[in-house]
Design a protein with these regions (language model features):
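Short, small-residue-biased leader/transition segments that mark boundaries at the very start
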Residues: 2-6, 241-246, 250
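Hydrophobic, well-ordered secondary-structure segments
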Residues: 19-23, 35-38, 46-52, 65-69
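Generic C-terminus detector
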Residues: 225, 231-242
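Beta-propeller domain segments
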Residues: 50, 55-216, 224
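Asp-box/WD-like beta-propeller blade repeats and closely related beta-sheet repeat scaffolds
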Residues: 7-42
Length: 250
């Protein structure tokens, strides 16, 4: 059966127990299938919303400008389309599109400069970190550092003119999930570092952008299957596990 992807907005109740006045900001068309939903939402410093969509395991939509699947979308807070989006004036293109050629974005974060970063699942290998720029094409499924699960090649290889390269890729894949960028006094040596959870190898990756995105793997029995990561204003780092309560790195 077809399944839809919704982005909703609501208000937290005064007692902090529920969301009220829910309304739909964006709804993607229903697609048959059960995977590659994407569905991360982050707010830029200027108030615009970035929404991620997966390719819904259909390959072609990620490069189809008339489709919203496999894209990063940019909306105003009320769900309307900003007039300065890159493809607003392009005939046949969905005006919400900010970037294209994505497979399945599972994490998104904004750094101190307002730059959007995402991580996304490859197929067998080829999980990526991408610095998302206005109007850019990130290649899926034309280029990839992964292969199909049967070992066959994907698309044309790893590079093509006019398509962006990832800042970092993992092979074997690590199944990236939650994404946060560090600020705050606690763990001040980590200022500006990127934190990404792994659903596959049970660790949190700390990436240092000042050192070529060198990776340190923070691992314990309690970091298994990390889904979400948050950095508080004081710099403390918390994460959620799929089956355990929220944990904090101390």
């Amino acid at each position: 059966a077809a399944s839809d992807v919704y982005k909703r907005q609501g208000t937290l109740s005064s007692d902090g127990t529920r969301l009220e006045n829910l309304r739909v900001l964006f709804q993607a068309p229903g697609v048959d299938g059960n995977g590659h939903f994407g569905s991360r939402v982050v707010e830029a410093p200027d108030g615009h919303l970035f929404l991620t969509t997966g390719d819904r395991q259909k390959f072609d939509p990620a490069q189809d400008m008339a489709r919203v699947e496999g894209k990063v979308l940019r909306l105003n807070r009320d769900g309307s389309v900003p007039s300065d989006n890159p493809f607003v004036a392009e005939e046949g293109a969905r005006p919400e599109i900010w970037s294209l050629g994505h497979r399945n974005i599972q994490g998104a974060a904004i750094d101190a400069s307002g730059q959007l970063w995402v991580n996304e699942h490859g197929a067998k290998g080829g999980d990526e970190v991408n610095r998302v720029e206005r109007g850019k094409n990130y290649g899926w499924p034309v280029i990839s550092y992964g292969v199909h699960y049967d070992g066959s090649s994907i698309g044309e290889g790893t590079k093509r003119q006019g398509m962006e390269q990832p800042v970092l890729f993992w092979d074997p894949s690590m199944a990236p999930s939650g994404y946060a960028i560090h600020t705050g006094e606690m763990f001040s040596d980590w200022e500006g570092d990127h934190f990404i959870g792994s659903l596959k190898f049970d660790y949190i990756a700390r990436l240092d952008p000042q050192n070529g995105f060198a990776e340190e793997r923070l691992k314990s029995p309690e970091t298994a299957r990390v889904r979400a990561i948050e950095v508080a204003p004081d710099g403390s780092v918390s994460y959620t596990h799929l089956t355990l309560p929220t944990k904090r790195i101390v």
